[in-house]
From Swiss-Prot:
Converts GTP to 7,8-dihydroneopterin triphosphate. It catalyses: GTP + H2O = 7,8-dihydroneopterin 3'-triphosphate + formate + H(+). The record marks 152 as: May be catalytically important. Disulfide bonds: none annotated. This is GTP cyclohydrolase FolE2. The gene is folE2. The keyword Chaperone does not apply. Pathway: Cofactor biosynthesis; 7,8-dihydroneopterin triphosphate biosynthesis; 7,8-dihydroneopterin triphosphate from GTP: step 1/1. The lineage of its organism: Bacteria, Pseudomonadati, Pseudomonadota, Alphaproteobacteria, Magnetococcales. Belongs to the GTP cyclohydrolase IV family. Its EC number is 3.5.4.16.
Amino acid sequence: MNNCQLPLSDVQSRQDHRRLDIDKVGVKNIRYPIVVKDRSVGSQSTTARINMYVNLPHQFKGTHMSRFLEVLAENQRAISIENLPKLLKEVKQRLDAEEAHIELDFPYFITKKAPVSGVEALMDYQVHFSGVMRGNAYQLTLTVEVPVTSLCPCSKEISAYGAHNQRSHVKVSVQFSQFVWIEEVVDLVERNASCELFTILKRPDEKFVTEKAYDNPKFVEDMVRDLADELTHDPRISWFAVESENFESIHNHSAYAFIEGGQRS
């Protein structure tokens, strides 16, 4: 019984003699409520999967995992994208680290109207924010994954009628000097696809999207090039990466393309 009153060993703080720094160590897949800026209504509450890491110098055996969760718990009413620099600074201080990383992955919802009937419904998009603080330097990367329709130009050209089309997932990552709305990235992708997707379509809407896709055929190469061209000419964007995966309807494989531009921090 008396042994229980002795100080508990801090194993993580012991010396490690392998002289190998660790770039990232921490916790993954923490589910937590967050608040995100919404262009239409001001803000939106959602649930994120959060990853938190720090670097670990070679002389330490381990990091103190519970301290990541303590930072979240102490800021549970104020976890937002705008608050990431504060959270990163606290993580660095609490774990005595030179750099800290926080990643947020969450569904984001936008109300969309069907193109003809005007029926409204929520559409979900997967969004990822990655914040890094090295010393006092802070960098934020926004990634948005947008599902769209792509229709093959070759299939349209060589066929007497019809053309194969499919759902595609387009992922756009940006670093920026001025604020960029999530909705802006979604709009950018959807206007450069053969056609955008909708949650609810009545028959007149279905006719519209079918014909629109047929009138706007796009290879996977076309989509990433068109997006990269617009991002290159946006003065707010310092770096971008664009990738598209087309889930081919006539093949048992996907088509894929990727473009990166600008200077990454």
